[in-house]
Amino acid sequence: MKTNYDVCILGGGLAGLTLSLQLKQANPKISILVIERRKGEAPDSAHKVGESTVELGTYYLREVLNLKDYLDEHQLPKEGLRFFLTPQHKDDISKRVELGPKATVPVPSHQLDRGTLENELAKRAKKLGIKILFNAKVSNININEER
């Protein structure tokens, strides 16, 4: 296994994987290692913070990381922030009062399934030559100042 990389990213979740992809886009020759403590792929139903994106987050995923087609095909569109009120109808959400924009929001956003998104990001990272090391724990960091 290769032991020297230009960049080592600790954490193979949404932030680490998107950073690795953006760095590789900026410099295709850079060598990147992503270290993740999880034993393998993320579970498809990984309920995490960041599932409901705002427009700026979606812009980054769609335009900067070129995930537009993937998001449109595999993730749910989100039509702005919505609230469902009146708890008298707990069993049927369609009978609750809904508060939110009446028109389609001009800038798209998505309700993300983080597990499937992170697995897609990992797949794209590997395809670009980014090494992902699963089931790893960082206990010490040595910085080579000569590089």
Residue ranges of model-derived segments:
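N-terminal FAD cofactor-binding segment of flavoenzymes
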Residues: 42-91
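A conserved short coil-to-beta-strand element within the FAD-binding core of flavoproteins
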Residues: 134-147
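N-terminal Rossmann-like dinucleotide/flavin-binding domain of flavoprotein oxidoreductases
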Residues: 63, 117-131
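Short beta-strand to alpha-helix junction loop
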Residues: 56, 102-123
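Conserved Rossmann-like nucleotide-cofactor binding loop
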Residues: 15, 19, 40
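Glycine-rich FAD pyrophosphate-binding loop
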Residues: 8, 24-49
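Glycine-rich Rossmann-fold phosphate-binding loop(s) that bind the pyrophosphate
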Residues: 12-14, 37, 114
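Beta1/beta-strand and adjacent pyrophosphate-binding region of the FAD-binding site
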Residues: 1-15, 33
